[in-house]
């Protein structure tokens, strides 16, 4: 997982670590990709778009193709990610439903923890 901002929740990596341990995948936490060599079969889970751009630039310089030489999953889908490098796989929450839920909680003056669904949009980068 690539996560360069200190203000991002580290619990995100805890969940990934638990998943990898359960299924026998190697994992590491990276604060950036600039000094990280890519190996066949590597998968980068990228939180910030800036890190995604850096990863794609480095791949171009090393003549590597996302989805063939290594994989990328990026957080939060955007129309641009549908086009970059033939399509970037994304993991994204349902922002519309999140807004509707928040609106209802505000109207009801309610406070509670809510599990919002996530979706994996599989594209060429994976």
Model-derived features: positions:
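Bacterial carbohydrate/catabolite-sensing allosteric modules
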Residues: 1-126
């Amino acid at each position: 997982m690539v996560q360069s901002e200190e203000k991002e929740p580290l619990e995100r990596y805890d969940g990934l670590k638990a998943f990898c341990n359960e299924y026998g995948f190697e994992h590491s936490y990276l604060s950036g990709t600039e000094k990280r060599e890519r190996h066949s079969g590597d998968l980068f889970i990228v939180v910030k778009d800036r890190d995604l751009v850096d990863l794609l630039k480095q791949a171009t310089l090393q003549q590597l193709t996302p989805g063939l030489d290594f994989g990328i999953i990026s957080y939060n889908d955007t129309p641009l990610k549908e086009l970059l490098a033939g399509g970037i796989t994304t993991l994204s929450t349902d922002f519309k439903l999140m807004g509707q839920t928040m609106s209802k909680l505000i109207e009801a003056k309610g406070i509670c923890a809510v599990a919002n669904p996530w979706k994996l949009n599989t594209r060429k980068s994976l």
